[in-house]
């Protein structure tokens, strides 16, 4: 098995291919159905192709989508599968999205308060 993530309990392994945003793939590879989505993300992160312009730094930078559904980290592969959308032959293709790291924002300091302008009033005493 390519990755673990819990007791197998006799579940059949599943062949998964991870499709990257440029159309290239990681895999296909076999994964136990008890494997968590977090473990799948770690698998993808460890095998990320070198030299890509956008690369994840942590599992939090990676989102995996299967059959149009974003997979939750704490769920297993068995819980995340959509049998109606899968082909009986060949690997399951899961899409990998990398969230671009946001540049650190500098906190804008509020502009310095200017003293209120004096609005003059002309009074004439007769």
UniProtKB/Swiss-Prot annotation:
Role description: May serve as docking site to facilitate the association of other proteins to the plasma membrane.
Subcellular location: Cell membrane
InterPro entries xrefs: MUB, Ubiquitin-like_domsf, UBL3-like, UBL3-like_ubiquitin_dom
SUPFAM superfamilies (UniProt xref): Ubiquitin-like
Major subcellular site: membrane
Gene Ontology cellular-component annotations: plasma membrane
Keywords, in A-Z order: Cell membrane, Lipoprotein, Membrane, Methylation, Prenylation
Membrane association type: Lipid-anchor
Propeptide residue range(s): 124-126
Annotated disulfide bonds: none
Record's protein name: Membrane-anchored ubiquitin-fold protein 2
Cysteine methyl ester found at: 123
Gene3D superfamilies per record: Phosphatidylinositol 3-kinase Catalytic Subunit, Chain A, domain 1
Species of provenance: Oryza sativa subsp. japonica (Rice)
Lipidation (S-geranylgeranyl cysteine): 123
Pfam families found in the cross-reference section: Rad60-SLD_2
Residue span(s) of domain Ubiquitin-like: 14-79
